[in-house]
Amino acid sequence: MYYEFLRFPGGKPKAVTLSYDDGCRDDIKFSETINRYGLKGTFNINSGFIAKAQNERCLTAEEMKKYIIDTGNEIAVHGELHRAPGKQRPIEGIKDVLNCRIKLEQLFGTIIRGMAYPDSGIHDFQNNANYECVREYLKDLGIAYARSLCGDNDGFKLPADWYNWIPTAHHNNKNIFAYIDKFNNRVLTDDTYISNREPWLFYLWGHSFEFRHADNWDHLEEICQKLSGKY
């Protein structure tokens, strides 16, 4: 698929998005941090693990609304029970995705068409599952895209296959700041050679709890500063 004439909202040739998984309590600090720099992201939620009351790991639906949705971020499907579609029988995979989408839409009153594959995603297949089958039932369930877990693409192009969307980089990628510099330094004008006019997307992914485990929230701060230009 060729995107030479595609532009992001406002006619912009470049955009930044963040995709973070599991709906854990660290998402509150993560959301507050990225919002401070004017960045937005997608929080991929397991509907079966939404907390009914405050606990140490998961957010409640009320907290998701307050700290994610009401601050201009969005939520997406991450499976009801965090099971890899590639390891489930198709009927189980369908149920896991559908139940998650229905529950999230009921809780938050919005249409949800995005997804990030949970666990090993489509990296490994068992129980008669295969990628073509997974892709087709996601389409039938109204899912418009699915972020993959097959590694980083180390680039900024939009996907050729929206159901195997490989992001630019995990936040712990050793080249993360070199990628940010390359992205920031790219200039696209009317004089840019026609084959180089495709839009660029910086697509960062991970889990917010990783910053707590590594005690490196300052790493997120530096990423946000460089991507936003706000210090």
Label the model's feature ranges.
Residues 1-74, 81-86, 90, 102-122, ...:
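Active-site beta->alpha N-cap acidic-glycine motif
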Residues 60-66, 183-192:
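Histidine/acidic residue-rich metal-binding segments in metalloenzymes
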Residues 74-78, 146-148:
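Non-cysteine beta-strand/loop elements that form the S-adenosyl-L-methionine
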Residues 194-198, 211:
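C-terminal anion-handling pockets and recognition modules
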